[in-house]
Each structure stands twice: as C-alpha cells, then as structure tokens.
C-alpha cells in the first residue's frame, strides 16, 4: 500500500470511528447499483446504513450548477454526481476522500479556487 493509500485509509477509519462520515443518496445508489446477488446487496446496504445520510436541498443542486459552471470556465467538464458531491462538501466545509479520477479533477479546480479543503 502506498503512503497516500495508507493516509486515506487511516483518515477514513478515523472519520468512521468519530462518526464524521456522511453520504448522499446518489452515492448510496451508485455503490449499490449493479450488485446482482441479493445477499451481497443486502449486506452492503446494511453496511451503508451505518453512515449518516446528508439530505439534499434545492441549495445543493443550485450550488452544484454554480460549481459546474466554474469548473467548465476552467476547461473541465464534471459529472453531475461528482459536482453534487463537491457542492455538499463545500456547504459542509468537509473533505472528500476518493480515488475517482473525474472527481479528483473537479476537487483540484475547486481547491485552487479556495472552495474545498
């Protein structure tokens, strides 16, 4: 495991133990989608129930649109779910732990703008 991977694992483990982890509905859906085996689906669903669900409001969607436009003006197209995750993180002043390359590019632009940790 690389140093970066170890750091992310430690950060995530600490955040879970401290109950600082939240997810939004679209992440829950994305993680569960495509699991064909009913038993595996139910096990993962139960595991995800341990995480607080951060409710989405009109503000989050409007903020996502604003951030999308900002990223686009910097030459980057962000996916709808990726930029929604960023909007929630900006509003909560929260960090995002991810290995998703598309989301990481969005985060880089928003960090450069001083909007994300």
What spans do the regions from the language model cover?
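Short, well-structured N-terminal submotif of metal-dependent ribonuclease cores
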Residues: 1-23, 33-46, 117
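Acidic, PIN/NYN-like endoribonuclease modules and their adjacent C-terminal/linker elements
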Residues: 11-13, 86, 90-117
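Short loop->beta-strand "edge-of-pocket" segments that line small-molecule binding or catalytic clefts
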Residues: 20-23, 49-55, 95
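Histidine- and aromatic-rich ligand-binding microenvironments
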Residues: 24, 77-79, 100, 116-117
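Acidic catalytic patch
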Residues: 50-73
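Short beta-strand scaffold positions
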Residues: 55-58, 80, 98
